[in-house]
Regions:
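Pan-zinc metallopeptidase signature
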Residues: 134-173
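Short pre-active-site segment immediately N-terminal to the catalytic Zn-binding motif
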Residues: 56-75
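Auxiliary, metal-adjacent structural segments of Zn-dependent hydrolase domains
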Residues: 1-55, 61
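Post-HExxH zinc-binding segment in Zn-dependent metallohydrolases
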Residues: 92-128
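Extracytoplasmic/secreted cell-surface and envelope-processing proteins
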Residues: 64-65, 84-85, 94
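Charge-rich, solvent-exposed alpha-helical interaction surfaces
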Residues: 9, 13-16, 79, 118, ...
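Active-site recognition of the HExxH zinc-binding catalytic motif
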Residues: 74-87
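Short, surface-exposed coil-to-beta transition loops
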Residues: 49, 68-71, 93-94
């Protein structure tokens, strides 16, 4: 099977993944998003690029991977969320928290699989601008993904909002 055929099967499976799947598949189709494979470090299952492409970690995924796998589909939804957020928001703990909560809520709704304790704590956090919550979120993400997942290098807020907070003490609204 070619990568293009596999990607089409992935989008078909995403469309069958409920209302959210249909929305995200439509987004990917409308933008003709390239979905490929790239070997990266073990703490990264997938990533997006500023060019609007999505890559799955070739260490974990290949053309042999089941496109209907709920873990794969929710991971794809996570990356699409980052494309929707844009470069600045996606590169913040705030953006990561939104994508992680979306991914794992959907995964556990669809599979009812037992949750890792760090994911359970992450899902219990209120999504918003509270800096203490965002710091906790980063800790839970690293507990789950490992220290090689460098969320600790990201600003808590999208960069412009982070700078405003640090200069003027103004929390985003």
């Amino acid at each position: 099977m070619t990568r293009a055929a596999w990607s089409q099967n992935l989008l078909l499976a995403l469309e069958q993944f409920g209302e959210e799947g249909q929305i995200y598949a439509s987004y990917l189709r409308a933008r003709k998003t390239y979905i490929g494979f790239w070997k990266v470090r073990k703490n990264v299952s997938a990533f997006w690029t500023p060019l609007g492409t999505i890559y799955l970690n070739a260490v974990e995924y290949s053309l042999e991977s089941n496109p209907a796998d709920p873990r794969l589909l929710t991971l794809l939804i996570h990356e699409v969320k980052h494309l929707q957020q844009g470069l600045v928001t996606a590169h913040s703990v705030y953006g990561e928290l939104e994508a992680w909560q979306l991914q794992f809520r959907l995964y556990h709704q669809k599979t009812n699989a037992r949750m890792h304790s760090s994911i359970r704590k992450l899902l219990a956090l209120p999504f918003g601008w509270d800096r203490d919550v965002l710091k906790q979120a980063g800790v839970f993400m690293q507990e789950y993904a490992g220290k090689g997942y460098r969320v600790d290098l990201l600003p808590l807020y999208p960069l412009g909002k982070e700078i405003r907070y640090r200069l003027f003490g103004k929390m985003p609204t």
